[in-house]
Structures are given as C-alpha cells and as structure tokens.
Amino acid sequence: QELQANLPAERCCDVVICAPYPLIGALEAAGQCCALGVGAQDVSEHQHGAYTGEVSAEQLSDLGAQYCIVGHSERRSYHGETDLQVNAKTKILLENHIIPIICVGESLAQREHDLTETYVAYQVAAAFSGLTAEQAVRCVIAYEPLWAIGTGNTATSAQAQEVCASIRATLAKLYDANTAKAISILY
C-alpha cells in the first residue's frame, strides 16, 4: 500500500527495486498493483549443480524477479567477482528471461590517471562478450563509479554524461549505433 501511494500512476521511466532474495516474492506480489519492476541483487554464475548458498537464475525467475544486478562494485571487491563471471551471469540471466543490470565503474585512482573511459570500456566489452545484438538490447548498464560509493561523493552531471556517452560509443563499436541507442544506461 505504501509503494502504491508513493508511486505516480503515470511515469516516464521504469521503476525497479532489487531486493535481497527472501523479499523478492513479497515485493513481486506488492509490485503488481503499481507496475513495479522487481529484481535480485545477485545470481549464481552456474545454471545447475550443487552450489551451496547460491541462487540460480531459474530460481529467481520462479520467485518473479524480472531484473538482476551483476558486477556490483561490492561483489567485485568483497567477493573477487571477475569480468568473466559478470559475463557468465549476464548470459544465464538472459537465458532465463531476466534483464541483467550490469554495473561498471572506475576507481578514484583510475579516474585521477585519466583511465575512466579505457577501464569502463573494457568492463562493457567483457560483459557483452558473446552476446548478440538481440541479447544486448535486453540488458541495462548502470554506471557506478567506485569512488562515489559510500564516500559521500557523487559524479557531477557532466562526469556522468561523459562516461555514459563513452559507454554508448563502446556499445556502438561492439554492435552498431542503433543497438547502442536501444540499451538503457543509468547513473
């Protein structure tokens, strides 16, 4: 009821909440009244098998998740998640009809050494490796600069726009301009 009361009936954008696993089902039920997208905060890179503690894309789909975050900076730094794992998770999510929200971003040192575009382009290319254009347009990219997480700092509008334009240029090189334009990029 609180969600419904606080979301405008007509919106110009999609609203998605990515919740911890135990809350996905309840959020999915609550979100039906107000066109709320429901997602998970992570997924296993493995489709099947005995991976204790892991939640598969198939399980997320059964819970009603429509989206899932992959490559979040906390997963990369605390759990050593690699670009190869982000790519594997992206592919598994797409196979299970879940929209991947692919996080990319640079550290403060990379920004200070003018490596932002190079590093972010590498992350994007790695995440989209092996994806067709049809698969790519089903993905969302979230620019998430590491230097802005939990620090109280935020990217300026100009900085965010510059990196988002660079991401779109990378996508155009990987695919084409129309495909790049069709992929949502968030900050």
Cite the ranges covered by each PLM segment.
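Active-site loop-to-helix "anion-binding N-cap" substructures in soluble metabolic enzymes
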Residues: 1-187
